[in-house]
Amino acid sequence: MQKAVYLVLLVFTSMCWAQDSSFLAVVRVDYSSTSGKEDTQFSLDKERHIFFIESDNKEELLFYNAFLKENEESHSAGTIKSVKRIKNTKAQQVYSFEWNFENSYDAIKSKAFVTLEINESETTNKESKAIITITNEKDLQLVYKGIILYYVNPLLFYYRLEKII
């Protein structure tokens, strides 16, 4: 599993360099639900990950919801807009933002509203966790929970989010 994570980071890093972008955070999804119905096994089978990526010119933040399993590659990707800070404590940060996205699998373009909750590890040997809730204009609600596999730097991550508030 760890080898797969490194491979994913290598592939996406290469893609980001080609597009003049850099990673801010990567979340491995360990739990998922669609409109209240748990579908965790689907996300695990497809190796769902969430990526926060910054463009090299520092003008845009991108949000990717991607399947990484070989021969199953598909994603929804787009820009983050209108970030609002809801909570900011040492143990927890909560943000909401608009996400203008396009799906690779059906070319649909739309807007969704995202809440990002980050629960920081209380000790240095535990991983921080994220809860991501995505709601679209048709009231579809997606909930993803998982471990933050990669942070470029937690302070930089928060700074970049807050810069576009």
Which ranges hold each PLM region?
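Bacterial Sec-dependent N-terminal signal peptides
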Residues: 1-23
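Tryptophan-anchored aromatic micro-motifs
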Residues: 19-42
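Short, hydrophobic/aromatic-rich segments at coil-to-beta transitions
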Residues: 20-26, 58-62, 89-102, 126-131
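N-terminal, post-signal-peptide region of Sec/Tat-exported proteins
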Residues: 42-79
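Short, low-complexity Ser/Thr-rich regulatory SLiMs
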Residues: 54-55, 87, 118-122
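Contiguous, well-ordered beta-strand patches that form the walls/edges
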Residues: 66-117
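Edge beta-strand at a domain terminus
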Residues: 68-89, 129-165
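Helix-rich interaction surfaces within compact, conserved domain-sized segments
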Residues: 95-152
